[in-house]
């Protein structure tokens, strides 16, 4: 990418994107902001997303009064993220919609908006870093290990990274808060949340029943089966459980029982003791490689199976069906189909894939 001069920054109304905007202005870029509206008019007929102009006052200082556009991507969000989310739960998997949203909605929407206004790069307030070396754009962890969001960006392409700036990558959250004060940022400090934005009150059961009215009749009253294959109870619907879950099973046992597998075809939940959650191996599909070419033979990498998981040495082997086999040196707990395994070399994100099964 040539040196950018006109940057389109995605803003959310929070401190992070506001500070990212101010930093870009301070660095001398011509900056325009866009608010991606993801949850508006979900039932409206499809229309090509169009930019609606406005203005943004990031702080009281006139240097930070910049052009603002809004882009309604609610239909795209519904089609690409919400339908994926629903389908994954129906298939007995536990999805991660933020990863899909980043690639399919946010980056795609920002790049589309940038083309419409003539910006030659986009920026976000994510805590991650990007660089170019050895003929390839590379993605790295953010400086703040507690806020690092690189795990959620493994689906980005070379073309995405080529047109992306990440102004907060070298900063910690306390430093961002201090900059917000110095800039006089008006944005509110949003409460940290791990909730899915379209699932009210983090109530997955109510959301799924509303999104798929036929679900209750289809999945209710299935069997809960122990490690010996004995039916020990009934469940209220396999989509309402996840691998590793202990609470809310409604069965009693001498030792705690955990969900070890979801069988959508048989409408069964398998449970076992905690040791049954441990496994060394998984299969993954729909892989995306950023920092390396897709492996043609076995390669030693570091892998994580969830956001707060620690990196563990693993051997990644490509299979003939397009999947990869991942074997960890140390066992992982509760490998969950539908979640992502993300690979690193130190702080660099090399790529990832969606987990199909753990064994």
Swiss-Prot record:
Q: What is one GO cellular-component annotation here?
A: cytoplasm
Binding positions (ATP): 10-17, 36, 125
Task: Tell me where it mainly resides.
Answer: cytoplasm
Broad enzyme group: transferase
Q: Where is this site: Interaction with tRNA?
A: 126, 339
Q: Which residues of this protein are catalytic?
A: 101, 197
Q: Which Gene3D superfamilies match?
A: Adenine nucleotide alpha hydrolases-like domains (2.30.30.280), HUPs (3.40.50.620), Translation factors (2.40.30.10)
A Gene Ontology biological process term: tRNA wobble position uridine thiolation
Q: Where in the cell is it found?
A: Cytoplasm
Write down the chemical reaction(s) this protein catalyses.
S-sulfanyl-L-cysteinyl-[protein] + uridine(34) in tRNA + AH2 + ATP = 2-thiouridine(34) in tRNA + L-cysteinyl-[protein] + A + AMP + diphosphate + H(+)
Any GO MF annotation of the entry: ATP binding
Q: List the EC numbers from the record.
A: 2.8.1.13
Q: Where is this region: Interaction with tRNA?
A: 147-149, 306-307
- Which keywords annotate this record? ATP-binding, Cytoplasm, Disulfide bond, Nucleotide-binding, RNA-binding, Transferase, tRNA processing, tRNA-binding
Q: Which SUPFAM superfamilies match?
A: Adenine nucleotide alpha hydrolases-like
InterPro entries per the UniProt record, alphabetical: MnmA-like, MnmA-like_C, MnmA-like_central, MnmA-like_central_sf, Rossmann-like_a/b/a_fold
Which pairs of Cys residues are joined through disulfide bonds in the record? 101-197
Instruction: Return the similarity comment.
Output: Belongs to the MnmA/TRMU family.
Q: What does this protein do?
A: Catalyzes the 2-thiolation of uridine at the wobble position (U34) of tRNA, leading to the formation of s(2)U34.
Q: What is this protein called?
A: tRNA-specific 2-thiouridylase MnmA
Organism annotation: Chlorobium chlorochromatii (strain CaD3)
Q: Which gene encodes it?
A: mnmA
């Amino acid at each position: 990418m040539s040196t950018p001069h006109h940057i389109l920054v995605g803003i959310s109304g929070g401190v992070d994107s506001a500070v990212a905007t101010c930093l870009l202005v301070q660095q001398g870029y011509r900056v325009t902001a866009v608010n991606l509206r993801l949850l508006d008019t979900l039932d409206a007929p499809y229309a090509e997303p169009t930019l609606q102009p406005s203005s943004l006052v990031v702080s009281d200082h006139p240097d930070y009064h910049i052009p603002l556009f809004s882009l309604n991507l609610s239909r795209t969000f519904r089609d690409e993220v919400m339908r994926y989310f629903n389908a994954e739960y129906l298939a007995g998997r536990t999805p991660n919609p933020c990863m899909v949203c980043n690639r399919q909605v946010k980056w795609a929407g920002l790049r589309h908006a940038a083309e419409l206004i003539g910006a030659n790069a986009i920026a976000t307030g994510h805590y991650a870093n990007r660089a170019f070396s050895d003929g390839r754009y590379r993605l790295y962890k953010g400086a703040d290990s507690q806020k690092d969001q690189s795990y959620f960006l493994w689906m980005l392409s070379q073309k995405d990274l080529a047109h992306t700036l990440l102004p907060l990558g070298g900063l910690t959250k306390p430093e961002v808060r201090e900059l917000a004060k110095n800039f006089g940022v008006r944005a509110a400090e949003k409460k940290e949340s791990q909730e899915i934005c379209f699932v009210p009150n983090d109530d997955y059961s109510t959301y799924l029943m509303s999104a798929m009215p036929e679900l209750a009749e289809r999945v209710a009253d299935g069997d809960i089966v122990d490690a010996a294959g004995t039916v020990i109870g009934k469940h209220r619907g396999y989509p309402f459980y996840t691998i590793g879950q202990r609470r809310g099973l409604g069965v009693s046992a001498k030792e705690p029982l955990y969900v070890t597998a979801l069988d959508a075809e048989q409408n069964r939940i398998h449970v076992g003791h905690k040791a049954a959650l441990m496994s060394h191996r998984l299969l993954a599909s729909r892989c995306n490689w950023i920092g390396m070419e897709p492996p043609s033979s076995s390669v030693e990498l570091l892998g994580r199976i969830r956001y707060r998981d620690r990196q563990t040495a693993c051997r990644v082997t490509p299979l003939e069906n397009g999947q990869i086999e991942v074997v960890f040196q140390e066992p992982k707990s509760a490998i969950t189909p539908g979640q992502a395994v993300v690979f690193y070399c130190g702080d660099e994100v090399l790529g990832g894939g969606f987990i199909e099964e753990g064994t």
